[in-house]
């Protein structure tokens, strides 16, 4: 909540030259965030705390903080920023690529790169290549080849061509050989620690001055499997200010069997060689990548220049800071193997499969990634913005039901049996009605106190008499809502014990919440979305016998 309040107050403060109007901000916060309307007191408290922080900031600091919290902006600012997302130097056909490593399925971080490349290739009627960068056998998960393509299809990313790097090794060998023949690369058998020491001092190793002829002979031995512990290095500036750019490696020996090639090959290109060759041969016009790849861009430009190739337009965007779910593929895989996680779609993970399982619609994620865009500033991934976009999509079709978690039996005396008809959706009468039958015994979620009055939602007022053996006993008081209001009675939802349906809801922490839903919940099908009133939106995952398993999507 604090980030949401901070965002609105900062926007308001900047609008009024550093003098925020908390009342105006409060109105906008509640107007655009219906879930906070029941928490006015708490929101007011947070506003007071946030105002103290804002008062210590200059206007420039306020703008910087707002850009961090809401990079896509609010209101009209959002529309303006959306119009600004475009590529520079677009000439003719645009060719772009999304290039993941097949070490597992895609996660939220991948979504940004895949969506932006798809967005621009569609915007400019271009072509999008999916390039699976699988030249490191140790990092390849065989099933990931298909999983990645399935994830992209779900996300709405249209792939025009699929390239698998492990199927192109002979092509990389061809260009590696050319670099050696031109004197731009050499085979190095120096000990790694020895080379590192020389590199840090800006000194060449003993292998750097060997002739192209000698290096070609060594290259042939590498390909024949006669050498180990050697690498091919690209000649750069040995005195470059960045030591990592000094004669970086472009080929290595790898004896680990490859999932696709087995042991047929044992010389594999490193990323900067294979990426450069592919980007050139596939005709990439624009390359989108994180600013953490700026050094790699400089490395790759050496190869472009040695071959006299045209360098594509590089766009380096800021880091997407994602808090919450696990994103490390190796940690996820290890957790799955150990049984800690149920699979790649475990609710605690940051995979697209996990988001899909929880009920996040691909259109919502796509929209948010386009709004985040390609700015160079680092960006915080705002879960609340994803949930808001998702709610806009699913709300209109989500039927409403009562759900009682951790149910407690409540027996009410003095009330006649009743039938309550409620709409399935407050704004869509065509979705029909649902029926609640009161017969004296109901389930509630709340711990009720003896002597207090409560209002049963859409029903009547009761007064609790006692709690005995985990059963709550109460008596009917009145129908009049004004009586409940006068007595400051809490309003609680309920369901009849009779015909109640057992439901398990799995939340974002993979915790199971057990409870009951009303009888008309039985009309839902797997993959439907519903809103459990005063609980949240859920996706129906499975029906087994008469029990349902759902995933909590968001509030």
Curated annotation (Swiss-Prot):
It is an enzyme of class 6 (ligase). It catalyses: tRNA(Glu) + L-glutamate + ATP = L-glutamyl-tRNA(Glu) + AMP + diphosphate. Gene3D superfamilies: 2.40.240.100, HUPs, Ribosomal Protein L25, Chain P. It is found in: Cytoplasm. The keyword Cytoplasm applies. One of its GO terms (cellular component) is cytosol. A motif ('HIGH' region) lies at residues 100-110. It comes from the Archaea. GO terms for biological process: amide biosynthetic process; glutamyl-tRNA aminoacylation. Keywords: Aminoacyl-tRNA synthetase, ATP-binding, Cytoplasm, Ligase, Nucleotide-binding, Protein biosynthesis. Coiled coil: none annotated. SUPFAM superfamilies: Nucleotidylyl transferase (SSF52374), Ribosomal protein L25-like (SSF50715). Catalyzes the attachment of glutamate to tRNA(Glu) in a two-step reaction: glutamate is first activated by ATP to form Glu-AMP and then transferred to the acceptor end of tRNA(Glu). This is Glutamate--tRNA ligase. It comes from Methanococcus maripaludis (strain DSM 14266 / JCM 13030 / NBRC 101832 / S2 / LL). The lineage of its organism: Archaea, Methanobacteriati, Methanobacteriota, Methanomada group, Methanococci. The gene is gltX.
């Amino acid at each position: 909540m604090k980030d949401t309040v901070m965002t609105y107050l900062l926007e308001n403060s900047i609008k009024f030259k550093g003098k925020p109007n908390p009342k105006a901000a409060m109105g906008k916060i509640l107007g655009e965030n219906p879930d906070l309307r029941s928490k006015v007191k708490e929101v007011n408290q947070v506003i007071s705390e946030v105002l103290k922080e804002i008062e210590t900031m200059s206007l420039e600091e306020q703008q910087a903080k707002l850009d961090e919290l809401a990079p896509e902006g609010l209101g009209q600012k959002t529309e303006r920023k959306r119009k600004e997302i475009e590529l520079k130097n677009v000439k003719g056909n645009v060719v772009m690529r999304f290039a993941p490593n097949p070490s597992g399925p895609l996660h939220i971080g991948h979504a940004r790169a895949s969506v932006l490349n798809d967005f621009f290739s569609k915007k400019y009627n271009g072509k999008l290549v999916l390039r699976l960068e699988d030249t490191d056998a140790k990092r390849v998960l065989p099933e990931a080849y298909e999983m990645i393509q399935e994830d992209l299809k779900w996300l709405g990313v249209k792939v025009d061509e699929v390239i698998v790097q492990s199927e192109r090794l002979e092509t990389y060998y061809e260009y590696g050989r050319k670099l050696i023949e031109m004197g731009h690369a050499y085979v190095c058998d120096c000990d790694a620690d020895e080379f590192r020491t020389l590199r840090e001092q800006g000194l060449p190793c003993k292998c750097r001055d060997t002739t192209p002829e000698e290096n070609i002979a060594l290259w042939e031995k590498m390909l024949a499997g006669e050498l180990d512990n050697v690498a091919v290095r690209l000649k750069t500036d040995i005195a470059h200010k960045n030591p990592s750019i000094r004669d970086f490696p472009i080929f290595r020996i790898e004896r680990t069997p490859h999932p696709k090639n087995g042991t047929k090959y044992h010389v594999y290109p490193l990323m900067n060689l294979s990426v450069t060759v592919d980007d050139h041969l596939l005709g990439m016009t624009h390359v989108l990548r994180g600013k953490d790849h700026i050094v790699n861009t400089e490395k790759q430009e050496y190869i472009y220049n040695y071959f006299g190739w045209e360098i594509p337009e590089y766009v380096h965007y800021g880091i997407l800071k994602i808090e919450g779910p696990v994103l490390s593929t190796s940690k996820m895989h290890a957790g799955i193997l150990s049984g800690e996680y149920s699979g790649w779609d475990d609710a605690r993970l940051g995979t697209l499969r996990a988001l899909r399982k929880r009920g996040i619609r691909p259109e919502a994620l796509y929209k948010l990634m386009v709004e985040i865009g390609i700015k160079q500033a680092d960006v915080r991934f705002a879960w609340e913005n994803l949930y808001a976009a998702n709610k806009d999509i699913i709300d209109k079709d989500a039927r409403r039901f009562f759900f009682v978690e951790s149910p407690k039996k409540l027996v009410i005396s003095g009330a006649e049996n009743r039938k309550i008809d409620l709409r399935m959706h407050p704004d869509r009468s065509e979705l029909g009605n649902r029926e609640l039958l009161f017969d004296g015994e109901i389930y509630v979620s709340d711990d009720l106190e003896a002597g207090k009055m409560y209002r049963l939602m859409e029903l009547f007022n009761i007064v609790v008499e006692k709690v005995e053996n985990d059963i709550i006993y109460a008596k009917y008081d009145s129908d009049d809502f004004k009586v409940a209001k006068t007595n400051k009675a809490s309003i609680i939802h309920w369901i009849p014990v009779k015909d109640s349906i057992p439901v398990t809801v799995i939340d974002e922490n993979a915790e199971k919440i057990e409870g009951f839903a009303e009888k008309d919940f039985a009309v839902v099908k797997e993959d439907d979305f519903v809103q459990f009133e005063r609980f949240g939106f859920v996706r129906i995952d499975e029906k087994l016998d008469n029990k349902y398993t759902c995933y909590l999507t968001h509030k």
